[in-house]
Amino acid sequence: MGATPAPRGLAEPLAVMQLALRSPGEAKVRYSNYRFSRLVASRLQLNDLDMASFPEILELDLASPSMQQSRPFNYQLRYVVAGYGLQTLFNDDGPGPYHHAIRPTGYDFHLDVVLPAAMERWRSDYRGMADHRQMLAASIIWLYRGRKDSCWLRRVPCTWDVVDALDALRSARAIADWGRLFALYPGW
């Protein structure tokens, strides 16, 4: 069997995702240094035209259940935080409305400083989570920061290969919830 041709017309992050889900072995060879953090951080670079192919790549119905809400990302974010037990990592005390109020714990946002004991508790709680829960939490941090992070995700597992991460999310039946977070993200 020959190599799978590169998908035409897809933005690179979506082409990586598609190959990782359809042909993991080939994706590991072709994108051997592609990290999950890079995929998540790419979300802000993807426009509506790029994202039109996302549901098909992930075999995901975006219309359910989040799209039934007036603010689908806010709903999905809160659903993931509560449904996957991430409440010790994120709280709802930010100054903005909706998803803008959700912020990671372990940091004093008024003084702009890390709270050492609270941050160590954050990292300890994170380390104690199953891989798929860590991946969801890290994804929220990367979306929140709009890039890779060295504040919360310092000295904790977060350097997953994109193929391994998508496989772990799929195996844990969490890929649809992750996919909705990624697809519905409007910016923070």
Predicted regions and their residues:
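Extended, charge-biased low-complexity segments
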Residues: M1-R127, Q134, R145-W188
